[in-house]
């Protein structure tokens, strides 16, 4: 690496540290639009009602995702229920067939990320969010029915799971679209983290709730229960939410003014899909800082979420019943830290104690560093108490990153936040290969967990350094420019110009130069004709 590049990287890190510990009072551009809102209980504010209801929506979605993972234990194995009755396996699926049915969900989930971001930027994001959970809820009920369609059960279930993945894949980009209209700049962290912590609550409650329903009733009960709950939630969401404060039914005038004036025009103008700054987005180092951190976060999250029970069983020799209860604590700790960090970040920014960039980099560095340190310890620890403590600290500390890179989309490009979220989540879904890597390295080899944790630690460290160097906290220049609305006639005109240009080049090669003169006199230059038309009129007015 050239000396200049090394010097620039060192300066970027030094500037971040200097901003973090400086006593300077930072004046945020958002504070220039000072509006006094009447103090009232936060649940009476519509934006907080939306945040809390979105929290439950994410919880339902992650509960739905846990249903099949729990139900399969009774479907493909001999099972003793809560009443002591033994049930024989109902389905003779192989491990490969079950794996194909489960993985089909993630294929649909990854495929819908980027299209969901574009749709959330173009249409009402609150309706897209609702449709995602509504479709997934219907698919959940259909899943319970589809398991009985022999002999094509596996194919039918794969299709249903893929559609369910497509539906739930729109949630994160759509929610970023919702906050684009509803979250004032200095409340983004706490509103967004309140909504997104629903995913941890869904994991924390979905697994034991599904296990209870499977054990006390049947394997199909969780599918029906979570499906019905999701449908009921969709009806409530449609009443509470709306596209923007201007279209809401019962929002107070005070809150409407508070939200719309603080957000300003940067987030309320429509955009043309043909004129989105795709090149600027994909060549922006700040955007790639978010994408890289999304990948790193997904790698660690999938590792700790999907494999911690297996790790406890194979390495720590903890019984599955006990490990299932223990797994609640990491998710609970993550929720607490995520909510607390969101409040802290907005306080530091609104009080002027730290700049937006310093806040994002600080909490991001803290979360990834704590997780990396604990994963490094897990590579060498074999004592169950110490190992479980490291797991809890790793998950708990990592909760702060949701107030770092995960809301940085709003800081650098608020109008394109749902699109950036879709791009980051879509590319970050590549981290799903981590499950395959983990299974390959640890198959009949408990010592392989050492290398799994060391690899995850290295990925976290890379994410910390990349974000420290390249992340930004202000709106980027290409995100400030108003979008050009291209009508159908303008599109046809642009295409006709290109066609005539190609035709002109062809004629020039053949020696026909009269076409250039003909094009100059054509209607392709309307501005000059208007000027010529105005000239006689101006002369006549001056003479009169």
Swiss-Prot record:
<feature type="topological domain" description="Extracellular">
    <location>
        <begin position="71"/>
        <end position="104"/>
    </location>
</feature>
<keyword id="KW-0769">Symport</keyword>
<feature type="transmembrane region" description="Helical">
    <location>
        <begin position="451"/>
        <end position="471"/>
    </location>
</feature>
<feature type="glycosylation site" description="N-linked (GlcNAc...) asparagine">
    <location>
        <position position="78"/>
    </location>
</feature>
<dbReference type="InterPro" id="IPR050382">
    <property type="entry name" value="MFS_Na/Anion_cotransporter"/>
</dbReference>
<feature type="transmembrane region" description="Helical">
    <location>
        <begin position="220"/>
        <end position="240"/>
    </location>
</feature>
<feature type="topological domain" description="Extracellular">
    <location>
        <begin position="215"/>
        <end position="219"/>
    </location>
</feature>
<dbReference type="InterPro" id="IPR036259">
    <property type="entry name" value="MFS_trans_sf"/>
</dbReference>
<dbReference type="GO" id="GO:0005313">
    <property type="term" value="F:L-glutamate transmembrane transporter activity"/>
</dbReference>
<dbReference type="GO" id="GO:0098700">
    <property type="term" value="P:neurotransmitter loading into synaptic vesicle"/>
</dbReference>
<keyword id="KW-0472">Membrane</keyword>
<keyword id="KW-0406">Ion transport</keyword>
<keyword id="KW-0325">Glycoprotein</keyword>
<dbReference type="GO" id="GO:0005326">
    <property type="term" value="F:neurotransmitter transmembrane transporter activity"/>
</dbReference>
<keyword id="KW-0915">Sodium</keyword>
<feature type="topological domain" description="Cytoplasmic">
    <location>
        <begin position="126"/>
        <end position="127"/>
    </location>
</feature>
<feature type="topological domain" description="Cytoplasmic">
    <location>
        <begin position="472"/>
        <end position="544"/>
    </location>
</feature>
<feature type="transmembrane region" description="Helical">
    <location>
        <begin position="105"/>
        <end position="125"/>
    </location>
</feature>
<dbReference type="GO" id="GO:0035249">
    <property type="term" value="P:synaptic transmission, glutamatergic"/>
</dbReference>
<feature type="topological domain" description="Cytoplasmic">
    <location>
        <begin position="1"/>
        <end position="49"/>
    </location>
</feature>
<feature type="topological domain" description="Cytoplasmic">
    <location>
        <begin position="176"/>
        <end position="193"/>
    </location>
</feature>
<dbReference type="InterPro" id="IPR011701">
    <property type="entry name" value="MFS"/>
</dbReference>
<keyword id="KW-0813">Transport</keyword>
<feature type="transmembrane region" description="Helical">
    <location>
        <begin position="361"/>
        <end position="381"/>
    </location>
</feature>
<dbReference type="GO" id="GO:0030672">
    <property type="term" value="C:synaptic vesicle membrane"/>
</dbReference>
<feature type="transmembrane region" description="Helical">
    <location>
        <begin position="128"/>
        <end position="148"/>
    </location>
</feature>
<feature type="topological domain" description="Cytoplasmic">
    <location>
        <begin position="406"/>
        <end position="416"/>
    </location>
</feature>
<protein>
    <recommendedName>
        <fullName>Potential vesicular glutamate transporter vglu-3</fullName>
    </recommendedName>
</protein>
<dbReference type="GO" id="GO:0006814">
    <property type="term" value="P:sodium ion transport"/>
</dbReference>
<keyword id="KW-1133">Transmembrane helix</keyword>
<feature type="topological domain" description="Extracellular">
    <location>
        <begin position="438"/>
        <end position="450"/>
    </location>
</feature>
<feature type="region of interest" description="Disordered">
    <location>
        <begin position="501"/>
        <end position="544"/>
    </location>
</feature>
<feature type="transmembrane region" description="Helical">
    <location>
        <begin position="385"/>
        <end position="405"/>
    </location>
</feature>
<keyword id="KW-0812">Transmembrane</keyword>
<feature type="topological domain" description="Cytoplasmic">
    <location>
        <begin position="345"/>
        <end position="360"/>
    </location>
</feature>
<feature type="topological domain" description="Extracellular">
    <location>
        <begin position="307"/>
        <end position="323"/>
    </location>
</feature>
<feature type="transmembrane region" description="Helical">
    <location>
        <begin position="155"/>
        <end position="175"/>
    </location>
</feature>
<dbReference type="GO" id="GO:0015293">
    <property type="term" value="F:symporter activity"/>
</dbReference>
<dbReference type="GO" id="GO:0050803">
    <property type="term" value="P:regulation of synapse structure or activity"/>
</dbReference>
<feature type="compositionally biased region" description="Basic and acidic residues">
    <location>
        <begin position="508"/>
        <end position="544"/>
    </location>
</feature>
<comment type="similarity">
    <text>Belongs to the major facilitator superfamily. Sodium/anion cotransporter family. VGLUT subfamily.</text>
</comment>
<feature type="transmembrane region" description="Helical">
    <location>
        <begin position="417"/>
        <end position="437"/>
    </location>
</feature>
